Structures are given as C-alpha cells and as structure tokens.
Amino acid sequence: MAMVACGLSVLLAAAAAEEYPHAFPRAGTKQLFDNERVTAWEVHWLKDTPQPIHRHRFDMAGVYLRYGPIRVTSPEGVVSPDRPPFEVPRPYFQKKGVTHREEAIGFSPDAPERMAVMFDVKDKIVDPIVPPEGMARAFPRDGANKAIDNDRVTEWDYTWKVGQIVPTHQHDKDSVQVFFQGGSIKFTAANGKVETKTFNFGDARFIPRGTIDSEEAITGSPRAITIELK
C-alpha cells in the first residue's frame, strides 16, 4: 500500500510539473519570428510585474542586451541569491527543462530593466553544408570571438568595421543573429547581387544554411552575436 501511495505521489508530481506553462509568451515578451529551427523572442523583465512559474520546454540560446536585476524562484519557493551585474552583450545558453519564476520585483526604482533576445531552439537537427572547394565558412573569421560552443549551438561575437571586407563565405549552418550595435552592412551574393541592410539595436534575423555572400560595413560599427544552430 505504501508503495502504491509513493508511486501515486510521483505521478501527481510529474503531472503537476507538466502543467507549468512554457516560458514564452508571457508579460514583457514579443515573438519576433518562428520557423522550423527556432522561435525568436524579445524579452523584457518588466519591473514590479508578477510572473508565473514556467518551464523551458526547449533548449534556449540568446543574448542579454541590457542588464537589470531579477529574482529567480524555484517551484519550491527557493529564491536564488542575487547575482552581480554583468557586461553586455552577454551570450547565453540553457538546456531545456529548467523550471522557475523570473521577476524584477522589489528593486530600486532606478534599477535598469533587463532585456534580451532569446531563441527556443527546436529539436530538429540539420547537418551542416560542406562549402564549395576553396570557400571559407562564415565562422570562424578574423576578429570573431567564440563565446559559447556545445552540442546545440556555437555563438560568435563579431564587430564589423567600415571599409573592412569579410571575404565571400558560406553559412554552412542555419544561424540567427542579434545586433547589439547598429549600422549598415553591404552584402554581395554569389550571383553578384548587392544589397545594403541597416540594423538597429535589438534587431534579430535568421540566416539559412547555404547562404553565400561577402560583407562590408558601410556606416557605424555593427556588432552582433551570431548563433550557429547544430
């Protein structure tokens, strides 16, 4: 009888855990785009706004664009210790299954509001493309810093400089890109087509694997975190 009761308790606990909503959407979030590889979210930890306990049902990759203090609480009510401020942009990765509440409640009115762009990384796995002979991959490249590398993603921090051309390359993996500093970049495709795009702080985009181009900053010093999906 005791074993039956114990088993029932385990099942009830598992069922309760399954009832937690996914981390997104919630107050302060906006979906940017969605495809077979990722769902992109702009996330603001709104001040003095209660949030539900939620469960991250996907691996999550992203980048914090602005620091702000938050309080993290487990389903059991345990509050994590406050952490010191961090520099931005801050690349981030978290495995699925994390369950908690994140709130910016009880801090100074002058405290900044945390902001990030986060990606739910879906379970679909896609093999990388082998670039044509003699053609470089998009990453690594000169000046790019590898911030995170694991079995799901590689995250690169890179700043374009005016007049400095990134030679023709192929994105061998599907990638997402989040801009921390804005500016305009000229892209020259394999067929010679030229397109100039202007990016602002917080902009995010998806780059399909197989994309071939060269890049050159035209204005500003665009800086972005590029997340290659494995």
Question: How should each PLM-predicted stretch be described?
Answer:
Residues 96-122, 182, 208-230:
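Ligand-binding loop in jelly-roll beta-barrel domains
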Residues 2-13:
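Bacterial N-terminal signal peptides
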Residues 106, 113-151:
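Surface-exposed beta-loop interaction hotspot
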Residues 15-22:
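Cleaved targeting-peptide boundary
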Residues 51-56, 81-83, 103-105, 158, ...:
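Short histidine-centered beta-strand/loop micro-motifs
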Residues 57-76, 172-191:
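Glycine- and acidic-residue-biased ligand/ion/polar-headgroup-sensing regions
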Residues 25-53, 57-65, 138-168, 172-177:
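A short glycine-rich, His/Asp/Glu-containing loop-to-beta-strand
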Residues 34, 76-97, 193-209:
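Short acidic-glycine-tyrosine-enriched beta hairpin
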